[in-house]
Design a protein with these regions (language model features):
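C-terminal helical subdomain
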Residues: 138, 146, 150, 154-196
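Short-chain dehydrogenase/reductase
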Residues: 19, 73, 120, 168-171
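Rossmann-fold cofactor-recognition segment
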Residues: 2-15
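A conserved hydrophobic alpha-helix of the Rossmann-fold in NAD(P)-dependent oxidoreductases
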Residues: 12-19, 149
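Catalytic loop of short-chain dehydrogenase/reductase
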Residues: 38-42, 46-70, 81-130
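Hydrophobic structural elements of the Rossmann-like NAD(P)H-binding subdomain
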Residues: 33, 89, 136-139, 149
Length: 196
């Protein structure tokens, strides 16, 4: 297996330069995983009630969780159209599921991940028309021991808290098992389907 890690800033110019570099190297993308997300930031936390919604905070959450992944995928679209059997995954979250929302709250985070899922669905429809061997995955990594989950880990049982290496192995395992069927899969780290 050969892994090529690429980094870029999230500007359109930076992403375009990365895509051009990969295109000129005739890179065949087998897996493209967009791994970014934010739940809280400077001066804001996940909303527990409608009255806590702050437009600036919500815009930041949507920028990171929804718009940035799509900006990456938009820049990489030419590669995805020409690569043999590319698997495209973006980190979603179970809390972005309408069918699995039993608690409410976390308005910005939940809705940003639900919006990401819809955009990934649109991408799956677009890609299948030009590259039927492509697959798109909205991936819920579980609760991973990262700065994003730190403030909320007290509510997570120790056996349910994944370490980064476990999360990476689970992602690899799930992506190794997906089938290019022209649809978007919404799955968790165990490979189980999440309801929309």
């Amino acid at each position: 297996n050969r892994v090529q890690v690429e980094t870029s800033d999230y500007t359109e110019a930076g992403l375009s330069a990365l895509a051009a570099r990969l295109m000129s190297a005739q890179t065949n993308v087998t897996r493209l995983v967009v791994c970014n997300g934010v739940l809280q930031g400077a001066g804001y936390r996940p909303e527990r009630a409608l009255a806590q919604i702050d437009s600036a905070a919500m815009n930041e959450v949507f920028e990171v969780n929804t718009f940035l992944p799509m900006r990456v995928l938009s820049a990489m679209a030419p590669l995805l159209k020409t690569s043999a059997a590319p698997i495209v995954a973006a980190l979603s979250a179970r809390v972005g599921s309408l069918g699995d929302n039993r608690r409410g709250g976390w308005y910005s985070y939940r809705s940003s991940k639900a919006a990401l899922n819809m955009m990934l669905q649109c991408l799956a429809h677009e890609l299948v028309r030009v590259n039927p061997s492509a697959k798109v995955v909205a991936y819920h990594p579980g609760t991973v021991d990262t700065p994003l989950s730190k403030p909320f880990q007290a509510a997570v049982s120790p056996e349910a808290l994944l370490q980064s290496d476990q999360a990476a192995e689970a992602l690899d395992s799930v992506l190794s098992q997906v089938v290019a069927d022209g649809t978007l899969s919404y799955v968790d780290w165990r490979g189980q389907t999440i309801p929309w």
